[in-house]
Swiss-Prot record:
The gene coding this protein: rpl16
One GO BP: mitochondrial translation
GO CC terms: chloroplast; mitochondrial large ribosomal subunit
Any coiled-coil regions, as ranges: none
Record CDD domains: Ribosomal_L16_L10e (cd01433)
InterPro entries reported for this sequence: Ribosomal_uL16, Ribosomal_uL16_bact-type, Ribosomal_uL16_CS, Ribosomal_uL16_dom, Ribosomal_uL16_sf
Annotated family: Belongs to the universal ribosomal protein uL16 family.
Compositional bias segments (type: Basic residues): 1-17
Assigned keywords, A-Z: Chloroplast, Plastid, Ribonucleoprotein, Ribosomal protein
Identification of the protein by name: Large ribosomal subunit protein uL16c
Protein backbone atom coordinates (compact mmCIF):
# COMPACT_ATOMS: atom_id res chain seq x y z
CA UNK A 1 0.00 0.00 0.00
CA UNK A 2 1.09 3.55 -0.69
CA UNK A 3 2.36 5.81 2.08
CA UNK A 4 5.02 8.53 2.34
CA UNK A 5 8.54 7.42 3.25
CA UNK A 6 8.88 10.33 5.67
CA UNK A 7 6.92 13.48 6.54
CA UNK A 8 7.82 16.66 8.35
CA UNK A 9 4.97 16.22 10.83
CA UNK A 10 3.28 13.05 12.07
CA UNK A 11 -0.22 14.51 12.45
CA UNK A 12 -2.32 16.90 10.35
CA UNK A 13 -5.54 18.85 10.67
CA UNK A 14 -8.50 17.39 8.81
CA UNK A 15 -9.00 20.45 6.59
CA UNK A 16 -11.82 21.25 4.18
CA UNK A 17 -12.55 20.11 0.64
CA UNK A 18 -14.05 23.07 -1.18
CA UNK A 19 -13.89 23.94 -4.86
CA UNK A 20 -12.76 21.87 -7.79
CA UNK A 21 -9.36 20.40 -8.55
CA UNK A 22 -7.26 22.75 -10.63
CA UNK A 23 -4.21 20.46 -10.67
CA UNK A 24 -4.19 16.86 -11.85
CA UNK A 25 -7.41 17.28 -13.80
CA UNK A 26 -6.11 16.59 -17.34
CA UNK A 27 -5.00 13.34 -18.94
CA UNK A 28 -1.20 13.39 -18.99
CA UNK A 29 0.08 9.88 -19.69
CA UNK A 30 -2.50 7.42 -21.06
CA UNK A 31 -5.41 7.66 -23.48
CA UNK A 32 -8.30 6.83 -21.11
CA UNK A 33 -8.87 7.96 -17.54
CA UNK A 34 -11.17 7.80 -14.51
CA UNK A 35 -12.17 11.23 -13.19
CA UNK A 36 -13.68 12.05 -9.78
CA UNK A 37 -17.02 13.90 -9.70
CA UNK A 38 -17.31 14.39 -5.92
CA UNK A 39 -14.99 15.50 -3.11
CA UNK A 40 -13.79 12.81 -0.72
CA UNK A 41 -10.89 11.21 1.09
CA UNK A 42 -9.68 8.11 -0.73
CA UNK A 43 -7.67 5.72 1.42
CA UNK A 44 -4.49 3.90 0.40
CA UNK A 45 -6.43 0.61 0.55
CA UNK A 46 -9.07 1.90 -1.88
CA UNK A 47 -6.39 3.19 -4.28
CA UNK A 48 -4.67 -0.21 -4.21
CA UNK A 49 -7.97 -2.09 -4.68
CA UNK A 50 -8.77 0.03 -7.75
CA UNK A 51 -5.27 -0.46 -9.18
CA UNK A 52 -5.52 -4.24 -8.72
CA UNK A 53 -8.96 -4.35 -10.38
CA UNK A 54 -7.64 -2.49 -13.44
CA UNK A 55 -4.43 -4.52 -13.76
CA UNK A 56 -6.25 -7.85 -13.35
CA UNK A 57 -8.74 -6.98 -16.09
CA UNK A 58 -6.22 -5.44 -18.50
CA UNK A 59 -3.82 -8.40 -18.00
CA UNK A 60 -0.41 -7.80 -19.58
CA UNK A 61 -1.75 -5.40 -22.20
CA UNK A 62 -1.50 -1.69 -21.59
CA UNK A 63 0.07 0.50 -18.94
CA UNK A 64 -1.60 1.90 -15.83
CA UNK A 65 -0.82 5.20 -14.12
CA UNK A 66 -2.09 5.93 -10.60
CA UNK A 67 -2.47 9.70 -10.48
CA UNK A 68 -3.07 10.17 -6.76
CA UNK A 69 -0.94 9.52 -3.69
CA UNK A 70 -2.10 9.20 -0.06
CA UNK A 71 -0.06 11.86 1.74
CA UNK A 72 -2.45 12.82 4.56
CA UNK A 73 -2.35 10.86 7.84
CA UNK A 74 -5.66 10.11 9.56
CA UNK A 75 -5.51 9.62 13.31
CA UNK A 76 -7.80 7.40 15.36
CA UNK A 77 -8.19 7.10 19.10
CA UNK A 78 -8.26 3.62 20.66
CA UNK A 79 -11.73 2.19 21.32
CA UNK A 80 -13.35 3.02 24.68
CA UNK A 81 -10.87 5.77 25.51
CA UNK A 82 -11.89 8.79 27.56
CA UNK A 83 -11.75 12.25 26.05
CA UNK A 84 -8.59 14.25 26.49
CA UNK A 85 -4.98 13.05 26.62
CA UNK A 86 -4.14 14.36 23.16
CA UNK A 87 -4.73 13.43 19.58
CA UNK A 88 -4.77 9.77 18.53
CA UNK A 89 -1.98 8.07 16.62
CA UNK A 90 -1.90 7.92 12.79
CA UNK A 91 -3.74 4.80 11.60
CA UNK A 92 -3.94 5.11 7.81
CA UNK A 93 -3.20 7.44 4.91
CA UNK A 94 -5.64 9.20 2.59
CA UNK A 95 -5.53 11.27 -0.56
CA UNK A 96 -7.72 14.39 -0.63
CA UNK A 97 -9.69 14.25 -3.89
CA UNK A 98 -11.71 17.15 -5.28
CA UNK A 99 -14.11 17.05 -8.25
CA UNK A 100 -12.29 16.91 -11.58
CA UNK A 101 -9.25 15.02 -10.29
CA UNK A 102 -7.89 12.20 -12.48
CA UNK A 103 -7.58 9.02 -10.42
CA UNK A 104 -6.24 6.45 -12.87
CA UNK A 105 -5.03 6.47 -16.47
CA UNK A 106 -4.58 3.58 -18.87
CA UNK A 107 -3.06 3.31 -22.32
CA UNK A 108 -2.22 0.64 -24.88
CA UNK A 109 -5.61 -1.10 -24.72
CA UNK A 110 -8.86 -0.80 -26.67
CA UNK A 111 -11.60 1.54 -25.49
CA UNK A 112 -14.02 -1.17 -24.37
CA UNK A 113 -11.29 -2.93 -22.33
CA UNK A 114 -10.34 0.41 -20.74
CA UNK A 115 -13.99 1.29 -20.05
CA UNK A 116 -14.69 -2.05 -18.34
CA UNK A 117 -11.44 -1.89 -16.34
CA UNK A 118 -12.25 1.64 -15.14
CA UNK A 119 -15.80 0.56 -14.25
CA UNK A 120 -14.32 -2.16 -12.00
CA UNK A 121 -12.02 0.42 -10.36
CA UNK A 122 -14.91 2.89 -9.99
CA UNK A 123 -16.88 0.32 -7.99
CA UNK A 124 -14.02 0.27 -5.44
CA UNK A 125 -14.16 4.06 -5.00
CA UNK A 126 -16.34 5.82 -2.40
CA UNK A 127 -17.35 8.54 -4.92
CA UNK A 128 -19.07 8.96 -8.28
CA UNK A 129 -16.64 8.95 -11.19
CA UNK A 130 -16.69 9.26 -14.97
CA UNK A 131 -14.72 7.63 -17.78
CA UNK A 132 -12.98 10.14 -20.03
CA UNK A 133 -11.03 9.87 -23.28
CA UNK A 134 -8.04 12.03 -24.21
CA UNK A 135 -8.64 14.70 -26.83
Amino acid sequence: MLSPKRTRFRKQHRGRMKGTSYRGNHISFGRYALQALEPSWITARQIEAGRRAISRYARRGGKIWVRLFPDKPVTLRPAETRMGSGKGSPEYWVSVVKPGRILYEIGGVSENVARTAMLLAASKMPIRTQFIIEG
